[in-house]
Amino acid sequence: MHSATAAIAALGVSPLIRIRGTHSDLIKRALDAGAYGIVVLQIHTAAEAGVVVSSSKFPSLGMRGQGLVFPAFIHGIDIPTYIRSANDTLITCVQIESVEGVRNVDAICAVPGVDMVFIGPNDLALSLLGYVPARGDEPEFQRAIENIVAAARRHGKWVGRLSNDGKASKIHLNVFDTVALSYDVRAMHN
């Protein structure tokens, strides 16, 4: 992970690491490896979002320990400077992709330290509709997306989503702050 984050950052791209669940040790490991942020999947409640923030931020915003010096080293700064700047510069993103997450999205977005909310449309469709992918025109799916975007905007959070193709991503960029296009596995397969 250390080599990958350094290589990605060297290209001028901000490496984010996806983490399944609110495991403090995995969040710390990703950030200690030099990730510029984390995306934590399957967040359903404000309490879970709070655990993510607490694990990813240094005191007084969280409980993250100093750990390795690698992030400071790759950023070319000393450790105290890295620690002072990390809470403001590293992205803490939670992914909403369930009916429960949509139901609690306003409370999730109200958690201080959550910087971005990302929509996982395929798992959201599976949870909401019982199938994937969503066609995109299902009223309940559209309402869920609109509710997530509205909550993020109300609380001053960035909001992003996955797009399954280039045409959709261009449309999504009119609404979302960031769009991930497809998956690396699909890109390699094609």
Task: For each feature predicted by the language model, list its residue ranges.
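Glycine-enriched alpha-helix->loop->beta-strand junction motifs that scaffold or abut catalytic
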Residues: 32-37, 57-58, 110-116, 173-179
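Hydrophobic faces of well-ordered beta-strands that scaffold small-molecule active sites
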Residues: 15-19, 38-40, 92-97, 117-119, ...
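Alpha-helix-loop-beta-strand connector modules within alpha/beta enzyme cores
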Residues: 1-24, 28-32, 54-62, 84-87, ...
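Short, ordered loop/turn segments at secondary-structure junctions
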Residues: 20-21, 43-45, 121-123, 164-165, ...
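Well-formed, non-transmembrane alpha-helical positions, independent of function
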Residues: 29, 107, 170-172
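C-terminal alpha-helical cap/extension of soluble enzyme domains
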Residues: 23, 64-78, 96-99, 129, ...
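Short, charged, surface-exposed secondary-structure boundary motifs
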Residues: 1, 48-51, 127-129, 188-190
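Conserved anion-binding
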Residues: 25, 37-112, 121-126
